[in-house]
Regions:
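Glycine-rich phosphate-binding loops of nucleotide-dependent enzymes
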Residues: 1-120
């Protein structure tokens, strides 16, 4: 039997009086591909933002490789092997390509220095 790589259990998130996610359960096994579909406002982006650490769930648990984790930031997600490609690229319009890349980089400073050296 394949072990779950990601488990969401009873994930809920509200913004004021608006319930964006209510008791969401999702299990993803290693080597599988899933899509999340729904109408506008159904809570898809909110759920993915919780998994990526941009939002914190009001309740529920998240497990990666059967270990319960707390995702307080995107860095926590990345450290647990979770990445996210945004539907709409979040670029700063008046920045250069290099500046946008460096802005989004969350790794060691060495990478940024090497990137700048390669660019110039």
């Amino acid at each position: 039997m394949v072990s779950p790589i990601l488990q969401l259990t009873n994930i809920s998130k509200s913004f004021g009086h608006v319930q964006a996610n209510k008791n969401i359960n999702l299990t993803i096994n290693k080597g599988t591909i899933h899509g999340i579909i729904g109408e506008n406002g159904a809570g898809k982006s909110t759920l993915m933002s919780i998994v990526y650490g941009l939002y914190q769930a009001d309740s529920g648990t998240i497990k990666v490789n059967e270990k319960e984790i707390k995702l307080k930031s995107p860095r926590d997600s990345i450290e647990n092997g979770i990445g996210m490609v945004h539907q709409h690229f979040m670029l700063v319009e008046n920045f250069t390509v290099l500046e946008n890349i460096v802005l989004g980089f969350e790794g060691e400073l060495v990478f940024g220095k090497n990137l700048i050296r390669a660019y110039f």
